Amino acid sequence: MVRMFADRGCQVIIFDVQDDKGETLAKELCDQGKKVVYKHVNLFDIDEIKNAYVWIKEQFGKLDYAMNNAGFGIPAKPLDECTSEEVNKVIGICLIAVTNCMIEEIKIMKENGFGRIVNTTSGAGLLGIKGNSVYCAAKHGVVGVTKAAALDYATSNITINAIAPGTIETELVNSLKEIAPDAYKQAEESNPSGHLGKPEDIANAAVFLCEDASSFINGVVLPVDSGCVAGK
């Protein structure tokens, strides 16, 4: 996703706590002439979040697009087997951090009279999934805050939408080929297309929701899953 926005000439700011990966990616793209900055931001720390957006405003004066893509999951299990620590971490990263970032993003966008926010939810934000009560709660929450906030700021030239990815060929998912080949095969076969999605599929959807062509699209959740949720 960072690459795709950078390829289109955007000044991209990465917020994360994985410093090695973030700094390596930023350097790689900067060496190619792209404009990318990595900034360490702990999304559990509201002061760090606020300070990060103050820094954006001071450095760049505006914020045109925001992609809230933070996520965290736990092994599937019944709700009563989840610990309070697990609940707090999943809800904290997947919903509370996203909401807190949106608040700061909207403040800057309102001042400039323009903004595009894209949140990442999941099929778990549209359906109930056995063994995933906490994750479903968080991702359903992202859907709710996306839709409600979209109505709040529609007259401010700010659109707020969400993407619901299916199973995507990330490093984690690809690792299943070796450690759990049956699970990987099941993931492939569960897609109507018969194969997994690629990171570029998600990035393309995010870019589209930030383009002028989508300026009248607001408050929607776009499944990017080859039709998985269509049949459920």
Regions found by a protein language model. Give the residues of each.
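Short C-terminal tail/terminal secondary-structure segment
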Residues: 73-76, 127, 207, 218-232
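Short, flexible catalytic-loop segment of classical short-chain dehydrogenase/reductase
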Residues: 160, 164-175
